[in-house]
């Protein structure tokens, strides 16, 4: 058993997180962690502190469902992976940073808009949005930046309609969101966060006098009006949904296109048999795992995991990109296989904090892939994969630009 109380720092704990050198493969350091025996390993964070990372699928599922691990980002022991997390500590918490029962109370206020039935009914609207932006991109072609002309605007418009946020303001909130999630220092992140908070505060004020559509309008008219939620809580909830609702799907779209184009046999099989699309989406989610630093927790009690002791107060990070490449769960885990059953991947997390918007993300990705295969059958990258500039490991994985041609 490893006793972290007597050995709080180890000399061989690698730096975490690491940057990808390939859009769809693990960083070398992550592969080494995965291939090292045991489900838990010590890593060193940017501030010199150490934390546990969870690298095995079974242990990851168990720990993500363990109530002794807290999601409280204001805890001094929370394993921050970047200086920007200091801005999170200084801000009102969205429900992603709350523990039960407060987490459940806040989440239930929004969940009706993300049920399977509700999202299934959005398919015609999502198809309209996807094809509308494809019309514009193709008209301006035969080259494009797939991120700015398609991958980013599609989920931005979809989440705007769902929340009731005016899409006319997309340039502002896309820029502020990007600054927040990609900031390398706390002050820049806090400034971006405050910019978004100010915008949403103004929108709430508007909805109090002129009832608004969408989820935000409903929360203003109901929960805010009757005191179930206060203004700062509403702002933080709306901010979380707005950012997560467009940043993650935009990144998944871009990386999915890169990955499929770089695996032509897999892409050809998908074009030939569209019944494979839902399964291919699950495999891409497993394979790419773009939110691979989202599983940060802090232990509130001692937890023993396969001979390792996580002490109360220690940071734990479930790295879903590594757990999704567990060879005991997935055969040949570093290979893309659109025919495999990847449904039990951890790209959306697990337990009470499992991604609220996962049904919407799946729908958007299915519609996007089908539309691209139908309407841009000759789509290809305009530069070699090796020349693409990848985001660092401290943020949502992806690219900020994706030159394509057809």
Curated annotation (Swiss-Prot):
Pfam families: p450 (PF00067). Its cofactor is heme. Induction: By herbicides. It catalyses: calciol + 2 reduced [2Fe-2S]-[ferredoxin] + O2 + 2 H(+) = calcidiol + 2 oxidized [2Fe-2S]-[ferredoxin] + H2O; calcidiol + 2 reduced [2Fe-2S]-[ferredoxin] + O2 + 2 H(+) = calcitriol + 2 oxidized [2Fe-2S]-[ferredoxin] + H2O. It is an enzyme of class 1 (oxidoreductase). SUPFAM superfamilies: Cytochrome P450. Residues 1-15 have a biased composition (Low complexity). Calciol binds at residues 81, 193, 236, 293. Keywords: Cytoplasm, Heme, Iron, Metal-binding, Monooxygenase, Oxidoreductase. Changing residue 181 to A: Decrease of the hydroxylase activity for both 25-hydroxyvitamin D3 and 1-alpha-hydroxyvitamin D3. GO terms for cellular component: cytoplasm. Changing residue 84 to A/Q/L/F: Increase of the hydroxylase activity and decrease of affinity for both 25-hydroxyvitamin D3 and 1-alpha-hydroxyvitamin D3. Increase of the hydroxylase activity. InterPro entries: Cyt_P450, Cyt_P450_B, Cyt_P450_CS, Cyt_P450_sf. Residues 1-24 are annotated as: Disordered. Disulfide bonds: none annotated. Two metabolic pathways exist. One is a conversion of VD3 to 25-hydroxyvitamin D3 and then to 1-alpha,25-dihydroxyvitamin D3 (25-pathway), while the other one is a pathway via 1-alpha-hydroxyvitamin D3 as an intermediate (1-alpha-pathway). Analysis show that the amount of 25-hydroxyvitamin D3 is predominant as the product of this reaction, while very small amounts of 1-alpha-hydroxyvitamin D3 and 1-alpha,25-dihydroxyvitamin D3 are obtained, suggesting that the major pathway is the 25-pathway. This is Vitamin D3 dihydroxylase. The gene is cyp105A1.
């Amino acid at each position: 058993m490893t006793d972290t109380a007597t050995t709080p720092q180890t000399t061989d704990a690698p730096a975490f997180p690491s940057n990808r050198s390939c859009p769809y493969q693990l960083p070398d350091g992550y592969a080494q962690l995965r291939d090292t025996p045991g489900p838990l390993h010590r890593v060193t964070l940017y501030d010199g502190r150490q934390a546990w990372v969870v690298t095995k699928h079974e242990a990851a599922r168990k720990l993500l469902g363990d109530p002794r691990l807290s999601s409280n980002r204001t805890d001094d022991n929370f394993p921050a992976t970047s200086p920007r997390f200091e801005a999170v500590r200084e801000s009102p918490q969205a429900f992603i940073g709350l523990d039960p029962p407060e987490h459940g109370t806040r989440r239930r206020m929004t969940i009706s808009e993300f049920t399977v039935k509700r999202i299934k009914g959005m398919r015609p609207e999502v198809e309209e949005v996807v094809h509308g932006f494809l019309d514009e991109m193709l008209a301006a072609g035969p080259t494009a930046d797939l991120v700015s002309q398609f991958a980013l605007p599609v989920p931005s418009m979809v989440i705007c309609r769902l929340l009731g946020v005016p899409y006319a303001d997309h340039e502002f909130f896309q820029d502020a969101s990007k600054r927040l999630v990609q900031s390398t220092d706390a002050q820049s992140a806090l400034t971006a966060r405050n910019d978004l908070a100010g915008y949403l505060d103004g929108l709430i004020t508007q909805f109090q006098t002129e009832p608004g559509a969408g989820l935000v309008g409903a929360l203003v008219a109901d929960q805010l009006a009757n005191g179930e939620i206060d203004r700062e809580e509403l702002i933080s909830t709306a901010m979380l949904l707005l950012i997560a609702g467009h940043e993650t799907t935009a990144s998944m779209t871009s990386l999915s296109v890169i990955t499929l184009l770089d695996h032509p046999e897999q892409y050809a099989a998908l074009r030939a048999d569209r019944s494979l699309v839902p399964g291919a989406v699950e495999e891409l989610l497993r394979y790419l795992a773009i939110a691979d630093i989202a599983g940060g927790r802090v232990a509130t009690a001692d937890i023993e995991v396969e001979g390792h002791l996580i002490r109360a107060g220690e940071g734990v990070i479930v790295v879903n990109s590594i757990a999704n490449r567990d060879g005991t769960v997935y055969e040949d885990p570093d290979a893309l296989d659109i025919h495999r059953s990847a449904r039990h991947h951890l790209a959306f997390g697990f337990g009470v904090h499992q991604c609220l918007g996962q049904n919407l993300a799946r729908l958007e990705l299915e519609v996007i892939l089908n539309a691209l295969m139908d309407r841009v059958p000759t789509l290809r990258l305009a530069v070699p994969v090796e020349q693409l500039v990848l985001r660092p490991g401290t943020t949502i994985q992806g690219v900020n630009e994706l030159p394509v041609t057809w």
